[in-house]
Amino acid sequence: MRPTAQNIRAMLSACLWVTVVLLAGVAPVAAVPRENHEEKEANLKQQATGGLFHKWTFDKEATKSIPGGFVPLSSGAGVSGIWSIEHDETAPSAPNVVMGTSVCEESTCFRLLIAQGLEYEYPDLTMRIRSADGVAGVGGFVFALRDAQNFYAVLVDLGAKRAQVIRVIEGVTTVLGQTAVTLKPIDWHSLRVQRNTIVSKDFIEAFVDGVLALSVEDQMLGTGQVGVVMQGKTTWFFDTLHAVPLFSHRPLSSPAAY
């Protein structure tokens, strides 16, 4: 006996129902394991013990050398970036700055300079930045870094006058937010990045020249290292880096159930 159209529809509906049930029982797998509540509380206590309040002006460093306490990393193909202490009397904290140069043409190239031995869950980061010609280039802060393939970054494109928050997981970049920014008519611009939390939501805020530019929610990555970053082909200058933990905004216990 040939199956009727009604029987065929019934069989297809049954198959679809079984597929939905099976898929519903499969939990999504994150590329990077997330912290549970106990791990977050332990990290908070560690953040509050001190030792994470740092300011770098680089003025006592020897020129033509990599800044002490920092290590270069590279994400993406191509030649590694070049980092060195240079003399610059125009710097906000003269005479020394950090200069970074990347010759990689691809936007997937990230050249990182990471502070060693320091990990933050909710960092408050500030610094002053400028590009070689004052108008072109992309650079900013990197944080929550686990390795060269897993991190957050806040980037400022001085030529396009744009700010971005990105997440890199296993080398794959996701833009979490971007917006146009108004830059002040000055040589050295300011960049501030805060990672904060309200109840169970983590969010990232970026301030350019003192103005809030972006606020995005994401909690894929947890505690990690911090540093500076360049994207693509550029030469950037960095000065007066501050890094402190924003632990005072972190709840000490789980929120009440209402």
Regions found by a protein language model. Give the residues of each.
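Extracellular glycan-recognition surfaces and repeat-rich motifs
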Residues: 62-98, 109
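Secretory/extracellular carbohydrate-interaction modules
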Residues: 101-165
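Short, aromatic/His-centered strand-loop micro-motif at the edge of beta-sheets
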Residues: 169-190
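Carbohydrate-binding surfaces in secreted/extracellular proteins
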Residues: 58, 127, 189-215
